[in-house]
């Protein structure tokens, strides 16, 4: 009945709240739990009944306490002791567990602490209206804010891969993060919380590609599942270490009883053969655990303090390290997983990591395969590589010299361990089966199978990402990791294979009782010879290693000289190229000046031609004007002549009329002379007047004729 009501309340909680991870019952319990609020309590899990495992000084407590006594404690013996018991408290870092050194909030974080701190004065005098300056870390400025980095990533995804952008989840809530911290029993860094408050990872069953160049960003639920899976792996490995060392299982010691102890097919923890077999596998596996930079990450395969935030769905993870090594930093981003016996610190914090991803997107180092819907990192040469390889190569390039020195030390340690292991095997077998010189020289280090790296560190092409850097791996890692995992699965078989030589030696002893002294003497002699030959072989190997080192140094010097010569040649070529470019530039300037002069001359000629054409047009216009004036004058003269002609014709008509009138008058006068004799005097007067008029008319006609002649002329 309670389960039914719990289901109903969970459903109502999921509908009425934006929580994605938190539930009603778990949220109420998480608020009362001491997991996230406890500063001194290490990680544990009551479901596994293994809480005692993390309470002893030899368990996973390194890096999970803030008390001065716990943070300053360390096992004696240095690196050798750490390798013998890698799960001990080995965190001598001064970095605070609960707050990043770049964070404004210097107090250990607990759910609700930031909200309650608003409005309160800080003990150092920092008020809510002031801003505390952030310190530089390792000479580097603080990382950009998580919100700014996510804004750049979202902008790129929205422009270039909107389908992938749709797969990013909605923000998580404060309740989700508080419950996750309670489940993980830790306090997450502030930048991780800020990132989850922007995007709660990607959809669990979305597209195959991840937002981090094909690497999937995990949501809170998947983070909890992955963390729990790797935590169980760490517990299982701790059990194997307990069996191999044969320690007495006690609650205070953090070691558990071997479940196979006392069975007829297995050896007891104190059995010499079982101890040799287990120590061989454990030592070989521990020898493969490494970190770059040195001492930054604990030398273990898995740790509950590593919180996975992204993975490639193949067992490789990008995580924040909440249990760093003595030279590490709390909250650093590391690579760990199935293919990473050597752990790499790729960023100081999750904020730095997101800023680096955003920079890679902005530089254009990406390619989307639309056929497979995969997002790849693209090099400058156009080749596609895994982003895990890119991150690993960047770290190796930064710590190249340190890796070379450590590789040399590791080889010397492997040779010494080989000699010691041969002596232990000889004592365990009673000295009857001493290794031959050929076998001694060809036998690898105990449990290593192959050197940790297939090539010297100086031969690794870790500078150029465009090469297939995926092939640059430690060939012995897979062998060593698989050897330990095989021991975990089937320990009885391994113990049985080691027992066989001992049974054979017992049979030989039974047959040779009569010659026991001769056998012992021969065995001692063979033992001495083998020891001398082993020392000689070790010395030769050391000499050869020194010669190889000298040859490598010489090759490095020659390479440096060649690079210097090449740089000088490039500098000379650059100077010559600059001089040639300068000469060409001057020549181009001269050509431009000549072109400008020619153009100016052409413009001047064109201007002169235009002026000449203008003057010619002006002269033509003047000629036309003079012709027009002459035409107007001629027209005026013609009009005058026509007018004179019209006047002359009028005068002629008047003269004709006068002649007619005169003739008519003469006729009338003749008639009147006959009728009127008395009027002679009057007629005489009239004739005189007629003569005057005639003379006047004649003079007028003469003047008109003269004018007409002048007009014709």
Swiss-Prot record:
Residues 400-412, 507-605, 613-662 have a biased composition (Basic and acidic residues). It comes from Yarrowia lipolytica (strain CLIB 122 / E 150). It comes from the Eukaryota. Residues 18-129, 255-274, 400-457, 500-713 are annotated as: Disordered. Residues 22-34, 66-81, 88-103, 413-429 have a biased composition (Low complexity). One of its GO terms (biological process) is fungal-type cell wall beta-glucan biosynthetic process. Residues 701-713 have a biased composition (Basic residues). Residues 663-686 have a biased composition (Acidic residues). This is KNR4/SMI1 homolog. Residues 35-65, 260-270 have a biased composition (Polar residues). Belongs to the KNR4/SMI1 family.
């Amino acid at each position: 009945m309670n389960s039914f009501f719990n289901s109903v309340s969970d459903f109502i909680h999921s509908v009425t709240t934006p929580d994605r991870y938190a539930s009603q019952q778990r949220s109420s319990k998480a608020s009362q739990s001491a997991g996230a609020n406890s500063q001194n309590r290490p990680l544990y899990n009551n479901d596994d009944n293994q809480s005692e495992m993390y309470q002893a000084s030899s368990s996973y407590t390194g890096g999970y306490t803030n008390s001065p006594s716990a943070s300053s404690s360390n096992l004696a013996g240095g690196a050798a002791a750490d390798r013998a018991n890698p799960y001990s408290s080995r965190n001598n870092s001064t970095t605070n567990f609960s707050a990043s050194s770049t964070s404004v909030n210097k107090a250990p974080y607990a759910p609700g602490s930031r909200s309650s701190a608003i409005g309160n004065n800080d003990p150092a005098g920092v008020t809510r209206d002031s801003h505390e300056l952030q310190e530089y870390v390792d000479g580097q400025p603080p990382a950009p804010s998580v919100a700014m980095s996510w804004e750049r990533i979202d902008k790129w995804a929205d422009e270039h891969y909107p389908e992938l952008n749709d797969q990013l989840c909605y923000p998580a809530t404060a309740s989700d993060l508080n419950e996750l911290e309670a489940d993980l029993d830790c306090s997450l860094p502030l930048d991780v919380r800020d990132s989850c408050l922007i995007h709660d990872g990607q959809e669990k069953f979305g597209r195959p590609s991840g937002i981090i160049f094909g690497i999937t960003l995990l949501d809170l639920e998947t983070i909890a599942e992955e963390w729990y899976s790797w935590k169980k792996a760490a517990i299982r490995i701790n059990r194997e270490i307990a069996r191999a060392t044969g320690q007495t299982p006690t609650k205070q010691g953090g070691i558990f009883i071997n479940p196979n102890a006392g069975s007829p097919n297995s050896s007891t923890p104190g059995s010499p053969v079982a101890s040799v077999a287990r120590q061989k596998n454990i030592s070989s596996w521990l020898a493969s655990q490494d970190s770059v930079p040195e001492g930054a990450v604990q030398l273990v395969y898995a740790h509950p303090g590593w919180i996975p935030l992204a993975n490639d769905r193949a067992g490789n993870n990008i995580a924040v390290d909440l249990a760093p090594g003595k030279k590490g930093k709390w909250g650093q981003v590391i690579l760990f997983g199935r293919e990473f016996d050597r752990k790499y610190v790729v960023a100081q914090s999750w904020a730095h990591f997101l800023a680096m991803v955003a920079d890679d997107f902005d530089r254009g180092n990406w390619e989307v395969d639309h056929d497979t819907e995969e997002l790849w990192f693209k090099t400058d040469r156009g080749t596609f590589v895994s982003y895990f390889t890119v991150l690993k190569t960047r770290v190796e390039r930064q710590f190249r010299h340190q890796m070379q020195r450590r590789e040399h030390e590791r080889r010397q340690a492997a040779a010494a361990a080989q000699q010691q292991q041969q002596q232990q095997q000889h004592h365990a077998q009673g000295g009857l089966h001493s290794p031959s010189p050929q076998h001694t020289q060809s036998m690898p280090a105990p449990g290593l199978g192959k050197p940790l790296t297939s090539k010297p560190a100086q031969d690794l092409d870790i500078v150029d990402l465009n090469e297939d850097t995926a092939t640059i791996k430690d060939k012995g890692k897979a062998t060593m990791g698989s050897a330990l995992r095989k021991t975990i699965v089937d320990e009885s078989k391994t113990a049985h294979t080691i027992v066989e030589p001992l049974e054979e030696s017992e049979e030989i002893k039974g047959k040779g009782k009569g010659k026991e002294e001769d056998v012992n003497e021969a065995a001692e002699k063979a033992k001495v010879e083998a020891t001398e030959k082993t020392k000689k072989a070790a010395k030769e190997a050391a000499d050869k290693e020194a010669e190889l080192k000298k040859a490598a140094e010489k090759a490095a010097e020659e390479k440096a000289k060649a690079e210097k010569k090449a740089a000088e040649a490039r500098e000379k070529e650059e100077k010559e190229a600059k001089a040639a470019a300068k000469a060409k530039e001057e020549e181009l300037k001269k050509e431009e000046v000549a072109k400008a002069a020619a153009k100016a001359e052409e413009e001047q000629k064109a201007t002169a031609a235009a002026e000449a054409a203008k003057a010619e047009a002006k002269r033509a216009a003047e000629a036309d004007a003079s012709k027009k004036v002459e035409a107007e004058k001629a027209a005026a003269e013609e009009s005058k002549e026509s007018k004179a002609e019209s006047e002359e014709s009028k005068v002629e008509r008047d003269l004709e009329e006068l002649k007619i009138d005169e003739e008519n008058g003469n006729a009338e006068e003749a008639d009147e002379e006959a009728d009127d004799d008395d009027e002679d005097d009057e007629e005489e007067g009239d004739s005189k007047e007629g003569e005057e008029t005639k003379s006047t008319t004649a003079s007028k006609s003469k003047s008109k004729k003269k004018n007409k002649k002048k007009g014709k002329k």
